[in-house]
């Protein structure tokens, strides 16, 4: 550089002092930086953005939205300034040290931001594909960003103080306890995110139920430290990511994948209405298409058993059909012939233990849809029919006395 200044002095016939030469050098570096900035940002990047917006290629639009090339351009500008500082300024001078340090800090910062943009581009592209969109990549990428920011921060500090990064890293060992306390949630969240992804425990869109945190809805975001759940009342519940590994939760995605949703509901039968069927009732019920095969086979089985016993002196020696058993058989056939009930999954009508509320008769079946509205409609239609048909079997539903029951009882006493 000094040779160049000497040649300028000889040609111009003037003497240039040190201050003037430094002003000239910094002016050249500044003008070069401005020209490079104009070329990159006003010409190259604007042209690229216009073509990306007009293009139908998704990856070009995502790159533009995340400003990946903008940050790469700033990184390139820092590299050019650093090269000029090495070329124009004498090594070891204060001006050279200051300018190269600033340029290197600039390069580190924008290189880190460029990596952040690249990760965002990968994440946005992954979310466009069904298979990759189900993975909790956001939390993993946030963890990578955190680690990258810490490493670059160490490099920048070591550059400013003029020490090796190894010295700083070795000094961090004494602060491990403090760092673990400060970065507890991010570290636990990163580990939890990897476990959730590796074990396929949770994906975006899954129906999650976690009563401890009041969460019951669809997962809309899996981050480094938190998981967001949109509840069915449209409220948002935030759950610490690590709690999904340390605590238990219910994931309904298996139900959605199976294509069938369970109906498990019981009705209470008044036990005082349970009795044997007489001949007239059997003949009337035999007209039902769903019951006819059952009544025929059951009647033959009972008659054969009674014939073998040969004793008809007491009802205790005989087998007879009951209204509750016939009703249970009817419900079983009704469900098996229902067009919206899965026949390849568990299907049964069973008695539960009787109690103060009568005899519970439970319907256990699966619908052929997992859509909530359709499921509720199918379930309601089934129980509407059950409530309406129960009296045909001489049975009564059990319920606690209502105001109407009390008024009827009071009217009976008045009479």
From Swiss-Prot:
Induction: Induced by growth at high osmolarity. InterPro entries: LSM_dom_sf, MS_channel_C, MscS_beta-dom_sf, MscS_channel_2nd, MscS_channel_C_sf, YbdG. It comes from the Bacteria. Disruption phenotype: The deletion mutant still exhibits an occasional MscM-like conductance. The null mutant is not sensitive to hyperosmotic shock. GO terms for biological process: cellular response to osmotic stress; response to osmotic stress. SUPFAM superfamilies: Mechanosensitive channel protein MscS (YggB), C-terminal domain (SSF82689), Sm-like ribonucleoproteins (SSF50182). GO terms for molecular function: identical protein binding; mechanosensitive monoatomic ion channel activity. It is a multi-pass membrane protein. Residues 46-67, 126-148, 195-415 are cytoplasmic. Keywords: Cell inner membrane, Cell membrane, Membrane, Stress response, Transmembrane, Transmembrane helix. The keyword Transmembrane applies. GO terms for cellular component: plasma membrane. The keyword Ubl conjugation does not apply. The chain crosses the membrane at residues 25-45, 68-88, 105-125, 149-169, 174-194. Belongs to the MscS (TC 1.A.23) family. This is Mechanosensing system component YbdG. It comes from Escherichia coli (strain K12).
């Amino acid at each position: 550089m000094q040779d160049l200044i000497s040649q300028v002095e000889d040609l111009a016939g003037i003497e240039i002092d040190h201050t003037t030469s430094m002003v000239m050098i910094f002016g050249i570096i500044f003008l070069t930086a401005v020209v490079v900035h104009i070329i990159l940002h006003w010409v190259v990047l604007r042209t690229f953005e216009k073509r990306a917006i007009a293009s139908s290629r998704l990856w070009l639009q995502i790159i533009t939205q995340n400003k990946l090339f903008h940050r790469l351009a700033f990184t390139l500008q820092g590299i050019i300034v650093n090269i000029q500082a090495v070329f124009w300024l004498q090594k070891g001078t204060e001006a050279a040290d200051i300018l190269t340090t600033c340029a290197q800090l600039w390069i580190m910062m924008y290189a880190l931001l460029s990596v952040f943009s690249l990760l965002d581009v990968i994440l946005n592209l992954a979310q466009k594909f069904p298979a990759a969109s189900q993975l909790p990549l956001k939390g993993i990428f946030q963890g990578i960003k955190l680690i990258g920011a810490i490493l670059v921060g160490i490099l920048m500090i070591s550059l400013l103080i003029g020490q090796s990064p190894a010295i700083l890293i070795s000094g961090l060992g004494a602060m491990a306890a403090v760092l673990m306390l400060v970065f507890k949630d991010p570290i636990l969240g990163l580990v939890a995110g990897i476990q959730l992804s590796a074990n396929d425990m949770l994906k975006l869109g899954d129906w999650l139920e976690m009563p401890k945190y009041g969460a019951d809805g669809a997962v809309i975001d899996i981050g480094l430290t938190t998981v967001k759940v949109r509840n069915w009342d449209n409220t948002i519940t935030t759950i610490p990511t690590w709690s999904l590994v340390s605590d238990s939760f219910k994931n309904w995605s298996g139900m959605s994948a199976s294509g069938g949703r369970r109906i498990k509901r019981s009705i209470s039968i008044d036990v005082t209405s349970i009795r044997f069927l007489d001949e007239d009732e059997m003949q009337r019920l035999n007209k039902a298409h769903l019951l006819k095969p059952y009544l025929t086979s059951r009647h033959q089985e009972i008659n054969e058993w009674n014939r073998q016993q040969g004793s008809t002196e007491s009802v205790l020696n005989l087998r007879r059909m009951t209204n509750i058993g016939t009703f249970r058989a009817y419900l079983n056939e009704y469900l098996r012939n229902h067009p919206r009930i899965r026949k390849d999954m568990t299907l049964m009508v069973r008695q539960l233990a009787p109690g103060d509320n009568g005899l519970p008769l439970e319907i256990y079946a699966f619908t052929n849809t997992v859509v909530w509205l359709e499921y509720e409609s199918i379930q309601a239609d089934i129980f509407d029919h059950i409530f309406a048909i129960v009296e045909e079997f001489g049975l009564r539903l059990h319920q606690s006395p209502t105001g109407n029951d009390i008024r009827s009882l009071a009217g009976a006493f008045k009479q």
